[in-house]
Amino acid sequence: MPTIQQLIRNQRQPVENRTKSPALQGCPQRRGVCTRVYTTTPKKPNSALRKVARVRLTSGFEITAYIPGIGHNSQEHSVVLVRGGRVKDLPGVRYHIVRGTLDAVGVKNRQQGRSKYGVKKPK
């Protein structure tokens, strides 16, 4: 607890909240080009091969983005749309690739939660 004299000398500084997705620079999404597409393993206690991509954004940042859904067509030089949103069991992955836009196609045979995976309504 500061003394009154200390508060007179220098005021309390307001706490500034930091953004969780700095590479987007306040934009809802950003376009980028995949530089590397690979799989990585989650931290304990989970076990899987999660599909991720290194993406160079138009803002100049090089980020790691998660590719959601079952199966994907992303490869090197694919142009993708990136949104914020971390993957809890992959350290350092703070972005998601948006399926169904640009070069990332929607998930095949998806019936439920289609809007999150870029799938049109089946006939």
From Swiss-Prot:
**Localized where?**
Plastid, Chloroplast
Q: What function does the entry list?
A: With S4 and S5 plays an important role in translational accuracy. Located at the interface of the 30S and 50S subunits.
What does the record give under GO molecular function?
A: rRNA binding; structural constituent of ribosome
* UniProt superkingdom: Eukaryota
Query: What taxonomic classification does the UniProt entry list for its organism?
Result: Eukaryota, Viridiplantae, Streptophyta, Embryophyta, Tracheophyta
- Name the source organism: Huperzia lucidula
Cellular component per GO, a single term: small ribosomal subunit
Subunit structure, interactors included:
Part of the 30S ribosomal subunit.
GO aspect biological process, one term: translation
- This protein is called what? Small ribosomal subunit protein uS12c
Q: Which family does it belong to?
A: Belongs to the universal ribosomal protein uS12 family.
